Amino acid sequence: MDKDAIESSIIIDLFKEEYKLDFEALNLQWIKKYFRVEEEDRKILESPQSYVIDRGGQIFFAINDGKAIGTAAMVLVEERIFELSKMAVEPKFQGFGIGRRIIDECIKFAKQHEAHEIFLITNDKLLPALELYRSSGFELDENYDDNRY
């Protein structure tokens, strides 16, 4: 695939009901590959409108030829604090800068909503994602302890 052609054909769109199944499928693909699907995953993936949008967050989609090939959610955790969550890019489209474009839109959204903190929770198994997050300005919090994972 031609990287320039792919990059120029991608549009970033906001959550629509028609993308709901794509949000779930894109995320289940990587979650099942590396981990197990947790109850919290199921809630957000099956009901993104109520768990993200209705609570003041947003879900972004990378669209190529009318198909959702990438996604990420900005979840409002508490006033002015957002979590970047449920980020996924279709494997055959990874490495084309799509994840970066989605993250950039997520950060822009948080800034527009006067966020004073954006965080994400990830796993060191996801090396390409870790590098993407670091290069997007995220920093490792050595003191953070999440015993869910």
Please provide the spans of the model-predicted regions.
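Conserved GNAT acetyl-CoA-binding A-motif
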Residues: 110-122
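Active-site acidic-Proline motif in GNAT/NAT acetyltransferases
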Residues: 90-92, 96, 124-125
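Acetyl-CoA-dependent GNAT
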Residues: 10, 14-85, 90-92, 103-105, ...
